[in-house]
Amino acid sequence: IVLMGTNDFNAGIPIGEWFTETEEQVLAARGEMKKMETCKKRTPVMDSNTYKGRINIGITRMKQLFPDKQIILLTPLHRAFANFGETNVQPDENYQNSCGEYVDAYVQAVKEAGNLWGLPVIDFNSVTDFNSVTGMNPMIEEQLIYFYDSGFDRLHPNTKGQERMARTLMYQLLALPV
C-alpha cells in the first residue's frame, strides 16, 4: 500500500510527464503484408526530479522486487493549514505550491498511475467534491475531530482519523484480489 503525494506537493516537485516519445522503425502488418513502419514509441520517464517520474521509478522497482504482490495506490488526503515552526508553515489546499500546482494535480497523477500501471487506487481525496472514501476533510471545521490539532496541524490525522482510515482501507482491500 503506497500513500504518496502530499510531501511532493509541499516540496513543489514539478508534476512532469509520464512518457517520452521517439520515432522508431518497427515491423507491422495491419491488414496488409508485413513491413517496416515508422511509429511513435513511448517510454516511461524515470526522472526523480518530477512527480510522475518518481512514481514510474517507484512502481517499476516495486514490481521488480515484489512481482507476486498486489500494489495499491492511495491518493493524498485533503490538506489544511499546518504550522510546524518558523521554517515549515504549509498553507491549505486552496493555495498553489511553489511550482504553481494545486494538490489536485498530485491526486490526479496517482489516479492516472493506477490506470497506466494496472494498479488499484483507493481515493482518499476526491478532486470533484468532498466525497472521498474516508469522508475526512480538514477544510471543513466539523471534520477537525479527525485531525491532530486545529490550531497548528490540520494536515495529519489523529488517532480517531487514523482509525477511520484503517477501517476504510480494510473494507476497500476486501474487494481486491490477494
Where are each of the predicted segments found?
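Alpha-helical cap/lid subdomain in secreted, periplasmic
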Residues: 1-177
